[in-house]
């Protein structure tokens, strides 16, 4: 999956690339990395292979994932699968990335996810968050992290 100015492009081996314009995305974007979750209700999930895929050993680099979303015109539920690299994904960062994508879509600014400069700035701010006090919702943590 590639985030571009005009929308998300799904690259699937052997088939033509599929462009999903930002205007079709509604209600946010969920992220699951790895497999093995049963749907916790959170927008960002890190399954068992997602956890193992960042550790040294035979699972390193395994456990791709998917972006899940509801599209309009026509209405449909979609999952766009992706491969992963062998870097470690902190559960906090997966959750905050999902929250960033969801809040950006909810604000009517889905196109910003295709703006490389803005996305780099936002992700850079989220990388500074390592944990947060119990009881704080990801939305509040995200808003505080992106505040100038």
Placement of each model-derived feature along the sequence:
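Eukaryotic intrinsically disordered, low-complexity regulatory linkers and tails enriched in Ser/Thr/Pro
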Residues: 1-2, 11-18, 27-148
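Acidic (E/D-rich), amphipathic helical modules within compact regulatory domains
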Residues: 21
């Amino acid at each position: 999956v590639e985030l571009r100015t005009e929308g998300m492009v799904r690259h699937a081996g052997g088939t033509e690339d599929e462009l999903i314009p930002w205007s079709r995305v509604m209600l946010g974007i969920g992220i699951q990395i790895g497999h093995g979750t049963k749907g916790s209700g959170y927008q960002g999930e890190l399954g068992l292979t997602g956890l193992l895929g960042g550790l040294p050993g035979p699972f390193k680099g395994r456990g791709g994932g998917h972006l899940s979303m509801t599209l309009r015109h026509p209405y449909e539920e979609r999952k766009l699968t992706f491969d992963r690299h062998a870097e470690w994904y902190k559960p906090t960062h997966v959750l905050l990335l999902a929250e960033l994508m969801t809040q950006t879509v909810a604000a009517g600014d889905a196109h910003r996810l295709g703006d490389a400069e803005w996305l780099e700035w936002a992700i850079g701010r989220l990388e500074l968050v390592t944990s947060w006090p119990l009881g704080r919702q990801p939305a509040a943590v995200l808003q505080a992290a992106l505040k100038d």
